[in-house]
């Protein structure tokens, strides 16, 4: 798991009572509304909607909120029609590659906010294609490792269409093609496994190790500021932070 994924997991676990929860649910709802608007209300034939729903479930968004967002998107919601997906790419401190996915109704505002975050944190916002070649789109499902038989987990994951299972600390990371996200989660849950999270992500082909606290803090400040931007849905980066450094930064 990349350092960004580990950091996101730490914030996820700490975030149940966090003041950002309302903002997070608003972002998740917006993603569901727009996905349903653009691709229809049936997740089976709408990969973007599948991902939006899986991500919302991973953050314990109530089922009724998810259903309400789908209904809004499949109706005549003017807000949904006004939003578009925009991808931004750039470099952070220490040459870390960063991809930002946003849903916006005002490109100029969003670009300004994201550029400000990069500039403030020793980064540079680049042009389209600047860093995307360093990543590949994958589905990632996380399962707590406690009490799990790895061989049985691999079989269940394969039944759902996964092509790799890795143990990372106290969590199994199940990797699959993007279109198999929902089927992998369903297969694991049907086999009795607890799914901690499941979403589409950009997996770095190579990573940059941030081996000291100072370097890690600089990059994480940029990631946090980008994720706190209202229009931003996802941030992906290719850094890796050793466990002991990440624990020190998170404490």
Question: What is each PLM-predicted segment?
Answer:
Residues 1-126, 130-140, 250-251:
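N-terminal cationic and glycine-rich segments that engage phosphates or anionic surfaces
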Residues 140-251:
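Positively charged, low-complexity, intrinsically disordered RNA-binding extensions
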